[in-house]
UniProtKB/Swiss-Prot annotation:
Example GO molecular function: proton-transporting ATP synthase activity, rotational mechanism
Domain of life: Archaea
Location(s), subcellular: Cell membrane
Function: Component of the A-type ATP synthase that produces ATP from ADP in the presence of a proton gradient across the membrane. The B chain is a regulatory subunit.
Name of the protein in its database record: A-type ATP synthase subunit B
Keywords: ATP synthesis, Cell membrane, Hydrogen ion transport, Ion transport, Membrane, Transport
One of the GO biological process terms: proton motive force-driven plasma membrane ATP synthesis
Species per Swiss-Prot/TrEMBL record: Thermococcus gammatolerans (strain DSM 15229 / JCM 11827 / EJ3)
Length: 463
């Protein structure tokens, strides 16, 4: 029953404790735990049956004693205090300030699990979000209200890319306020300092809310961190009409925490030991992106995950791909070449790109230009494989131009500086500069009128 206090803890293992002899306890209920020394911790009911409750302890179960620990069930779900004053602040994984600033005086308290959106109330994601990164803006465009994950690998610069996107992202031609909610799970102190420094030195912190769960924090916190971030994002988007970009890194650490808790509960494991409900659990996070009819605000998600052994068929990227609307794939081969960001545009995809580009959104030539760049780069890549077998001497003059185009595409279009913020028009013009490498007769995916208007040969003649 709400408010009842129990000292009937029968077992503690991993991040979990079992409390017996309880009555009226509900799933998801917040629990207050007090040690013999008076230290207080919080937890949440994971399972309630008959007279028994399984509780996950957010701050971990270290130093908890079965005989002296007291547990009080509050009768409430986990809520996060929300306020506009959270912009510019840094919090830990469970929402406590870690930037030396004061506690937040809440305007409201919201359930971390959010309110489910009626599918009929959803508005279709449209409108281009400029990240300033050519490989994304030009080839795999991010659309307002979309969920577009970044598939990375261990040692690849996804943290730099996340910080760059958070710093540069904007909605063109809009007066609406833009905000970034950044949630990091299971990161090292070095990574946490990098994100803090990156946001503070560039001034991006002023429009951002940061949640940082460190690697030595209890794994259970990682389950709460993305939900805290999304609850704040929903508040900013739907109460204050802001355009909110939510960046979640690293979802692999989140899934590992999910597996750890599942193993502690002795649940039947699914693929590679992950719980069978991982798809549903990930969906409760990813599906909180979107737009709502009658509301000006939006939530756009960019979850980042590191693929174990660079395996895109691993359960985490595999299930993520089913729920989200595309993927940005980072390439170890491009990284070895010294190309940043090492985005491989061929396996990358933005399923909603077609609805966020073109006349009135980016530029009229954007859809056909991106298709032509994609086709030309794919041809150049396949010719590289051929050259490895037969040598470059066997290639025709046109084939050599495709080969040169592929090299320039990687060095000039994909590659850019960490502090380089390219406009969409600079990106598109750069694409045309590269296509000028090829014979005009090879540009079969672009209308003649666009060639005459944007091709460097005619553009310079016209000017």
């Amino acid at each position: 029953m709400p408010g009842m206090e129990y000292s009937t803890v029968s077992k503690i293992y991993g991040p979990l404790m079992i409390v017996e002899g309880v009555k009226g306890v509900a799933y998801g209920e917040v629990v207050e735990i007090e040690t013999e020394s008076g230290e207080k911790r919080k937890g949440q009911v994971l399972e309630a049956r008959e007279n028994l409750a399984i509780v996950q302890v957010f701050e971990g179960t270290r130093d908890l004693d079965i005989k002296t620990t007291r547990v009080r069930f509050t009768g409430e779900t986990l809520k996060v205090p929300v306020s506009m004053d959270m912009l510019g602040r840094i919090f830990n994984g469970i929402g406590k300030p870690i930037d030396g600033g004061p506690e937040i005086i809440p305007e409201d308290r919201r359930d971390v699990h959010g309110a489910p959106l009626n599918p009929v109330a959803r508005a279709y994601p449209r409108d281009f979000i400029q990240t300033g990164i050519s490989a994304i803006d030009g080839m795999n465009t991010l659309v307002r209200g979309q969920k577009l994950p970044i598939f990375s690998g261990s040692g690849l610069p996804h943290n730099m890319l996340a910080a760059q996107i958070a710093r540069q992202a904007k909605v063109l031609g809009e007066e609406e306020q833009f905000a970034v909610v950044f949630a990091a799970m299971g990161i090292t102190y070095e990574e946490a300092n990098f994100f803090k420094k990156s946001f503070e030195e560039t001034g991006a912190i002023e429009r951002a809310v940061l949640f940082l769960n460190l690697a030595d924090d209890p794994a259970i916190e990682r389950i709460i961190t993305p939900r805290m971030a999304l609850t704040v994002a929903e508040y900013l988007a739907f109460d204050y009409d802001m355009q909110v970009l939510v960046i979640l890194t690293d979802m692999t650490n989140y899934a590992e925490a999910l597996r750890e808790i599942s193993a502690a509960r002795e649940e039947v494991p699914g693929r590679r030991g992950y719980p069978g409900y991982m798809y549903t659990d990930l969906a409760t996070i990813y599906e909180r992106a979107g737009r709502v009819r009658g509301k000006k605000g939006s939530i756009t998600q960019m979850p980042i995950l590191t693929m174990p052994d660079d395996d895109i068929t691993h359960p985490i990227p595999d299930l993520t791909g089913y729920i989200t609307e595309g993927q940005i794939v980072l390439s170890r081969e491009l990284h070895r070449k010294g190309i940043y960001p090492p985005i491989d545009v061929l396996p990358s995809l933005s399923r909603l790109m077609k609805d966020g580009i073109g006349k009135g959104r980016t530029r009229e030539d954007h859809p056909q230009l991106s298709q032509q760049l994609y086709a030309a780069y794919a041809e150049g890549r396949s010719l590289r494989d051929l050259v490895a077998v037969v040598g470059e001497e066997a290639l025709s003059e046109t084939d050599r131009k495709y080969l040169k185009f592929a090299d320039r595409f990687e060095r000039e279009f994909v590659a850019q500086r960490y502090d380089e913020d390219r406009s969409i028009f600079e990106t598109l013009d750069l694409g045309w500069e590269l296509l000028a490498e090829l014979p005009e007769s090879e540009l079969k995916r672009v209308r003649k009128e666009y060639i005459l208007k944007y091709h460097p040969k005619y553009r310079k003649r016209g000017s």
